[in-house]
Amino acid sequence: MAKVTDFKVADLSLAEAGRHQIRLAEYEMPGLMQLRREYAEEQPLKGARIAGSIHMTVQTAVLIETLTALGAEVRWASCNIFSTQDEAAAAIVVGDGTPEDPQGVPVFAWKGETLDEYWWCINQIFSWEGELPNMILDDGGDATMAVIRGREYEKAGVVPQPEANDSDEYIAFLGMLREVLAEEPDKWTRLADSIKGVTEETTTGVHRLYHFAEEGVLPFPAMNVNDAVTKSKFDNKYGTRHSLIDGINRATDMLMGGKNVLVCGYGDVGKGCAEAFDGQGARVRVTEADPINALQALMDGYSVVTVDEAIADADIVITATGNKDIISYEQMLKMKDHALLGNIGHFDNEIDMHSLLHRDDVIRTTIKPQVDEFTFPNGKSIIVLSEGRLLNLGNATGHPSFVMSTSFADQTIAQIELFQNEGQYENQVYRLPKILDEKVARIHVEALGGKLTELTKEQAEYIGVDVAGPFKPEHYRY
């Protein structure tokens, strides 16, 4: 392989440490390793040029090397300013080479990026020499949004100026687009024409995709990986159940037993949060807007309350809604002195971080990286993790390898599906076919030593399915 010269990571000398962790993770990621074996000769992604934007973790490193093992070329950035594991990023750049002669994949990611640096990195995954990228692998929808809004502003001939209430992140995003428009005035239009499809990892990004489709501005097919059963019911719930506690422990060493905890949101992620705290002996209450989810919480044994009535005596508050404006500045003023506030939704707008970071009468004291104390005019203070961003990735290393194996196997299969079937999908949002979802589950059942019951032909006919599956209709709720 040729020497990699186009990259930006923290420190290539970390590559050996990263490689050891990647090697161990491979044993815990049977889905990806099985796909490597199954498709080694076929090379179904040969010719794919993937612009990837997912947290640059050890588990993502195994995904990247699976994509390249199946024939793809890849450029990568993280989808969060705090989530990169620098040793994993270094190992992927070095590849089979050395720190002095790196021969891996171009990566643009390091832990602790500024917002301007973050959007610079996103731009880099689309800046290929020669041919343009033809696939996007996204988490949160930022890479996809860059192409869609970039093309829109190219057509208008101008990038709009930020408005007074725009977030710092959106201001940085517009700044990146403005610079690109000045240097390459047709870049995003050419990219939109080149991309065959996007596969999206998370709930927030899927919401964006459906919004773009409704607007009529989605320029290529999109695969909703998040709502694959082997993603949402495993990564979102069981992964969160593990990594939330890991993040809080690494950040604070706080004992959770006996504490009053408020979990905002009771979707798959919120369910994982509530179970995690319950398992630690905490007293858990839940907020929820959807009556079905609220009823589930009640039946699972949790009180369902509003933020206003519960925040004053909560020791820990966690947002997990995927929505915005969940915890306001005024509500933070009511919190217990030294209460803990964190978020495990994709973006930082669930908590009013803008007020915390920009008010002159709020004093910020950094305890350690991604752990800050904010002191209010009333003398009370709260501890905020990862500046309101994903605490499980900012304060820890995210979900464990095995559960990410299911998600990333889904991503790999979705990339193959869209890349190999160009023209068969319209510019809409699709779910991963059920038979492929079941394939991913089957691999992991076997890896855990489970033995599946095989239906007889008569049994399969009786319930109207094929002996080999799929076993459930699309509308089935697991």
Swiss-Prot record:
The entry's keywords: Cytoplasm, Hydrolase, NAD, One-carbon metabolism
Disulfide bonds: none
Cited NCBIfam families: ahcY, PRK05476.2-3
Record-listed E.C. numbers: 3.13.2.1
InterPro entries the UniProt entry points to: Adenosylhomocyst_ase-like_sf, Adenosylhomocysteinase-like, Ado_hCys_hydrolase_NAD-bd, NAD(P)-bd_dom_sf, S-Ado-L-homoCys_hydrolase_CS
Source species taxonomy: Bacteria, Bacillati, Actinomycetota, Actinomycetes, Mycobacteriales
Annotated compartments: Cytoplasm
CDD domains: SAHH (cd00401)
Protein name listed in UniProt: Adenosylhomocysteinase
Positions annotated to bind substrate: 57, 139, 201, 231, 235
Broadest EC class assigned to this enzyme: hydrolase
Superkingdom per UniProt: Bacteria
Catalyzed reactions: S-adenosyl-L-homocysteine + H2O = L-homocysteine + adenosine
Residues reported to bind NAD(+): 202-204, 236, 265-270, 288, 323, 344-346, 392
